[in-house]
Amino acid sequence: MLLFLAKGTDTYPEGLSYGGHPWVQRASRPYAITHGLDGRHLSLWASHGRYYDNQKKEWRWQRPYLFCTTEDLLSQSFVYPFLIPMLERAGAVVFTPRERDSQSLEAIVDNDTPTYTGTYYEKGDWITPEGKGFSLNYPALCDTIFPFETGTSRLARGGSRARAVWRPQIPETGRYAVYVSYTTFPASADNVHYVVHHAGQTSHFRVNQQMGDKTWVYLGHFLFHAGQTEENCVELLAEDSPSGTVVSADCVRFGGGRGRVERSNPDVCYTYPQRMVQRMDTVTTDSLWRSKLLADGWHPDSIPPRICVQRDTIVTDTLAHYLYGKGITSGLPRYLEGARYYAHWAGLPDSLVTRDHGLVDYNDDLRSRSYLLNVMAGGSPFVPDTVGRRVPIELQFALHTDAGCHRNGDIYGSLAIATDYDDYGHTVYRSGLSRKVSERYAGKMMNDVAADLSSLYHVKWPQRELRVKNYSETRSPQVPSMILELLSHQSYRDMTFAHDPNFKFHTARAIYKSLLRQAWHLQGKGEPVVQPLPVEAVSATLRGDKVVLRWSPVRDELEDSAWPTDYVLYSRQGDSDWDDGILTHGSTEVEVHVERGVHYQFRIGALNAGGESFPSEPVSVYLSPTHRVSTASTVLVVNGFDRLSGPARVESCGRLGFDLSADVGVSYDYNDSFSGAQQNFQITAMRQEGVKALGYSGAELTGLLLAGNRFDGIALHTEELKGVRPDLNVVSMSRAAFDHLSSSELHRYALIDYVAGLQADVPHNLQPYTVFTEKSQALLRAFALEGRPLFVSGAHLGCPAASADSIRLVMNANFMAETLHCAYRAEADHTFSGMFYGMGMEIPIYNRPGELHYPCQRSDILEPVGASAFSAFSYSQGGFSAGVAWTAPARGIVMAFPFDCISDASVRRTVMQAALDFLLQP
């Protein structure tokens, strides 16, 4: 067998591959991937997660709170929002032994409890087969309760009219991951048809039920509206599977939920059963007996050395009994918990969840990651000669950070880890691969990541060591595996990169590319194609009664193959979810028909043979139902807020660290990596531990999702414009597209609504984010000089740009004074007050980090300039000016806080009404 090969190979032996249907495939995806990871199965995880410390009898993290985070919060902020989506957009099926959905709410719909948080019902002929399935009979789990062993599943014939429907009771409107489960049988179908109905859209999936049963099988993330409605459900259609096969239905889960595993130290009691055993006792010969035998003529060498006597003996055994009582849960969303608890929830056999009778969770957590991987991959072509669930997983990757720092402030850098033998000392994988492959894989990964980061950030990213040693996470997996210790969470310099979303994206892309090439190398193939970067300069404008969408591809200077060859256009209407997209056949300009009176959003994905990019920022269009195109006025909404940034830094007077109260930063979509505010800034405390350590931080933000830049400013402004003035047309574009316009193209617009959000060129950005480029200033100036109104809102419109020289600073100040009729005076802090005043009302804003919206923590004090300008908003009743308005040569309003940060929906609508009444006066 391959197991006993002496040396192993560097690539999979010829003919060793998986060519069947993948575990999960999105059937409604409108394109094929030929040179990416389509149909390939990978396993990866991020660090450790929260675990129960049996000695201290408390839940804790493995690492301390440093620089506003801890390792287990930080590493997953690279993996879940960036790395896993990149791999999936390349076509890969990604398995992770930890919960991946940050949604803390949950709905579970199961055949055994058909009305629990939803409704399960069937049509056609179904039976309950022998064997076990999922059931949630208990609100919490202990070490004697395993949910995939307590229930049943259902079975129907393939090709029949049987149908199963899971309709959840969704707690709140939001995005939820959808997981299905089932039982595998000898005749299971390999292409079972699931349909997800989500907020007005329908997505189709094919699931291979010949593998990966009795666990949570991820389909995707979808928008669901609150409640139990017809448009929120999952269907299984048996008629689309071949006759002669069977399809299985078990539980469907919506959302990640919160941890259910209760932990405590078990009580141990002992019993002492007795049993009878037969023993052969020995009696050594004495001198008298020996003398007698010699006298009888025995030769000295022939005398028996001993005499054996058989007798019955009673033996008392000691048996330990472990009694598991009520414990405590982590109190956190499930995605923050360690693999040991997810494995318990996700169907790992009890004998593998804990090997120490629940006495040492830390060790169980280390082992369970690899055990769950091996159980899933066992019996596949890549892990033959074992019993498992036959998922053809080829590679494993783990992302961690570690400790260490340089006193001179240099970057500490990366470390890669591999192990060249398994738990039994074997140096060859069951597939026939040499375990030396993992060493080369780890070394290449570290080199690839360092090369990309060095090039993109103009630094020399250190490669500390390729460590080939005994680590559970790299020793136990039965496929090539590695750990990348990306950086040091103890090093302030490293953390200035780690907190930045751009760095997270680029790091994840470097890892994805290295995994892509490793997977192709193991199959002995040539060069793969790297998925493109997201497109830019997106616009949605009108041509008659049609919408014209335009965009520009982005060249990846590090990857020649990453150029797009086609594009996917996605759309949504009103409050519906995004559809599955249509191809544009290579065109970067498309014309689409829209229904009048409906708010549409569009976004674009760049595509090539290697997969699809991250989506572009969305743009909106609204066509008035009450005017002909030739007479309806049109508002142009420009998104000038594309900033992504880490938090504010403290670098002065012997102090070093991050100040979340000054600026929490701007994450991509959301941030769940913060534990709490930094408390120790003393640089002399470098390399110390605990509360005395430089960077020591609090835990008040642990488990919270903090909203960042969701690129939804255009949509919100469009919705308010539509609500206030449905007679207006609304079009929109990104700032890059706006900068490509000529001044003559502005004549078609009655108003420009410029959305600046938290755009700011500040020192802690890893790249500059100018509020107004020179081209934007020129266009806005020309528009105003023609007597057309401007509506501009943002927190840092006049704040001096950190990267600007003295000439540029003067130009910016002149633009603010001459075009926006205001002058920057100082910055106001909103830590204690989130209330503005203007237009005869109080205007509340989101001023603190939270899940609903990004916060406006500080903003400009802008005073009016010019005879026609006046202060229209203030920071308190009669306080500093928070915005201006003017009447000549055209009307305009500048708000020193983001309009979309107004937290009260009715106030926001009233403010927009008042603004339009003022700006669009005849």
Show where each model-derived region lies.
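A short beta-strand element within beta-rich, extracytoplasmic domains
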Residues: 162-186
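Active-site-adjacent mobile loop/cap segments within catalytic or ligand-binding domains
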Residues: 147, 230-233, 239-240, 251, ...
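Non-catalytic propeptide/linker segments at domain boundaries
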Residues: 1-48, 53-60, 249, 254-262, ...
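Aromatic-Pro/Gly-enriched surface loop or interdomain linker
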Residues: 82-90, 98-99, 621-751, 755-758, ...
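Beta-strand-rich modules
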Residues: 591-611
